[in-house]
Amino acid sequence: MYAGQRLIASDGYEVALFPMADMYLTQGEYGSVSHDLAMDFQGWSNGQRVYQCPYYAPFSCTCVRAGGSGENYRIFTSDTPVHCADGGFSVLTFVVMHDNNPIANEGDHFTQGDLIGHSGTARPSGTDPIGDHLHLNVAWGGYAGWSPTTHGAPYYELTNSIHIYDGLFVNDTILVVDGGYNWRIYDGPTPPTPVTTPKKKKFPWFIYNQRRLYRKY
């Protein structure tokens, strides 16, 4: 996505987008260092690396946690359910790490496309240095805490973590290094018009089916 970009489906709900203009993946799922479903991305633009690369709100969201033992993590939760890349329709939560000068504070609200941070090298004191990058982890639902990764302590990811490519579409992101994952573009499948529940539910199974299809779009 690019700065200021918004993508709203015909039902009025936002489409979740990958937060950088260029994708250059440096560590994928179940990497050798610490990850299960989180990924690392370095900044990239016009054929060269970008340090302190900007990234944007993938959907309208609120910062619900800020802090983090030198990692400078920031956790955001979507304001409403959003259309997800696997066809789902859900509230999403995500965490970003390593911004040396984070701009988001707990309680701050951002509209889809707003600047929310930059890639960086922030790490706890006494630990090995890292290269400039964005650490990104996405989860279903609201913030539900942390769960240990398969690497064990001190490595954790968001509880209810998902594949990033199942949550975020890559519309208007240039895929430089994408790891071969199943990234998807939202091509405008139109959600059905929401069904108005009648006063007398003569055919409740019909209403249920329509709601399910609406959620899946």
Regions found by a protein language model. Give the residues of each.
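Zn2+-dependent peptidoglycan hydrolase active-site motif and core
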Residues: V50-Q52, Y56-I103, G120-H135
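Conserved catalytic-core segment of clan PA serine endopeptidases
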Residues: S10, V15-T26, G88
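Solvent-exposed coil/turn segments that connect beta secondary-structure elements
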Residues: Y30, D79-T80, A139-G141
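A structural signal for short beta-strand/turn segments enriched in small hydrophobics and glycine
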Residues: C61, G107-S119
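Residue-level detector of conserved, well-ordered beta-strand and adjacent loop positions
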Residues: T26, Q42, M97, T111, ...
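Short glycine/threonine/proline-enriched tight-turn/helix- or strand-capping micro-motif at secondary-structure
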Residues: M20-F59
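Acidic, glycine-rich catalytic/binding loops that coordinate metals and/or anionic ligands
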Residues: M1-A16, S45, R49-V50, Y56, ...
